[in-house]
Amino acid sequence: MVTIGTPKSATATKVVLCGSGELGKEFVIELQRYGVEVIALDKYPDAPAMQVAHRSYVVSMLDGDALREIIEKEKPDYIVPEVEAIATRTLMELEEEGYHVIPTARATWLTMNREGIRRLAAEELGLPTSPYRFAETEEEFKEAVKVIGMPCVVKPIMSSSGHGQSVVREEKDIDRAWQYAQEGGRAGAGKVIVEGFVDFDYEITQLTVRHIGGTSFLEPVGHVQVDGDYRESWQPQAMSLAAKAKAREIAGKITEALGGRGIFGVELFIKGDDVIFSEVSPRPHDTGMVTMITQDLSQFALHARAVLGLPIPNIVFHGAGASRAVVVEGDSDRLSLGNLDKVLEQPDTQMRFFGKPEVHGHRRMAVLLARGLDVTEAREKTGVMMEQLNVKL
């Protein structure tokens, strides 16, 4: 029997959220609907999820001692990582001491670095993947590029959203790719993965939720990425029945191997009826923001239910929808978005302004959402919304 107490009282059900970005913000809002007391952590103040949590701490999630100090002080019922860069050894110790890490500390550890999850997928589970080699030194890296061949993709094993990722197309790109990967890793310089190019028609995110009633699969999400970072997504992605079945089979295998409860974003390449595993995140996925307008229970609502041990008897899909990221370029700590009366004048449109305190360089600051008769119409709507949006730095 699931029981939730009163926030900020002795009976409170408490969640510590490790990472407070825009995905965490929506998750916190869903937890608040159930009366859960939320403590949000991030490395900078006034992060999006902090703005809707009961309280917050500014801390590096890679600082295991600082993380432990907060956990021991707050004594949460659940520890929910929202970022890859986190002190996984500390999480594993805390789990052994009786704390509940979502989905599990092992899943967080495996997916924090591309080596752990790639070896699990390809070598233990036998899932189809791109050819790959790992390299720890520049010499090993150059040898890996030689073995894999060009063009190839180079990524730090610990990074996300395209940080440190580049494509080696010819000899002159090799040195630059190594340096960029060393500078772009979330946890500093280190090992990289060199991946062979995959010939694919399109890529999808197969959102998969593990809950007390079993495993549920959402309609496939198609997306566009620029330099490894999400720019646009839509649901459902049109695909053959055979490919759809294989996508769910692969997603089921990898999420079962990771274990625990919660939402997983399984990234896959599709070529005809063939499906190739790419990556998995054991948390809400940026491309999955489209579910805020396409489903009765968004990926964030599903994650909240799964974490709390609440049932998910069904998921209602309202119809085709699209999301478009608002990526701002410049320097500002007083960003404003204008002309919103025009942006939202089309039927079946929504937006989320994340409220990030500042931008330096490129930063995703909002998302535009639309439903349509089909995916094409929904994407066109978000395109019109973007044209109408007035960004002021």
Curated annotation (Swiss-Prot):
ATP-grasp domain boundaries: 119-308
Family: Belongs to the PurK/PurT family.
Lineage, highest ranks first: Bacteria, Pseudomonadati, Bacteroidota, Bacteroidia, Bacteroidales
A GO molecular function held by the record: phosphoribosylglycinamide formyltransferase activity
Catalyzed reactions per annotation: N(1)-(5-phospho-beta-D-ribosyl)glycinamide + formate + ATP = N(2)-formyl-N(1)-(5-phospho-beta-D-ribosyl)glycinamide + ADP + phosphate + H(+)
Gene3D superfamilies: 3.40.50.20, ATP-grasp fold, A domain (3.30.1490.20), ATP-grasp fold, B domain (3.30.470.20)
Subunit composition and interactions: Homodimer.
Keyword Nucleotide-binding on entry: yes
GO cellular component: cytosol
InterPro entries per record: ATP-grasp (IPR011761), ATP-grasp_carboxylate-amine (IPR003135), ATP_grasp_subdomain_1 (IPR013815), PreATP-grasp_dom_sf (IPR016185), PurT (IPR005862), PurT/PurK_preATP-grasp (IPR054350), PurT_C (IPR048740), Rudment_hybrid_motif (IPR011054)
Residues the entry annotates as binding Mg(2+): 267, 279
Binding site for ATP: 114, 155, 160-165, 195-198, 203
Pathway it works in: Purine metabolism; IMP biosynthesis via de novo pathway; N(2)-formyl-N(1)-(5-phospho-D-ribosyl)glycinamide from N(1)-(5-phospho-D-ribosyl)glycinamide (formate route): step 1/1
Keyword check for Protease: no
EC number: 6.3.1.21
SUPFAM superfamilies: Glutathione synthetase ATP-binding domain-like (SSF56059), PreATP-grasp domain (SSF52440), Rudiment single hybrid motif (SSF51246)
PROSITE patterns: ATP_GRASP (PS50975)
Lineage top rank: taxon: Bacteria
Listed name of the protein: Formate-dependent phosphoribosylglycinamide formyltransferase
Gene Ontology BP terms: 'de novo' IMP biosynthetic process
Amino acids binding N(1)-(5-phospho-beta-D-ribosyl)glycinamide: 22-23, 82, 286, 356, 363-364
Organism the protein comes from: Parabacteroides distasonis (strain ATCC 8503 / DSM 20701 / CIP 104284 / JCM 5825 / NCTC 11152)
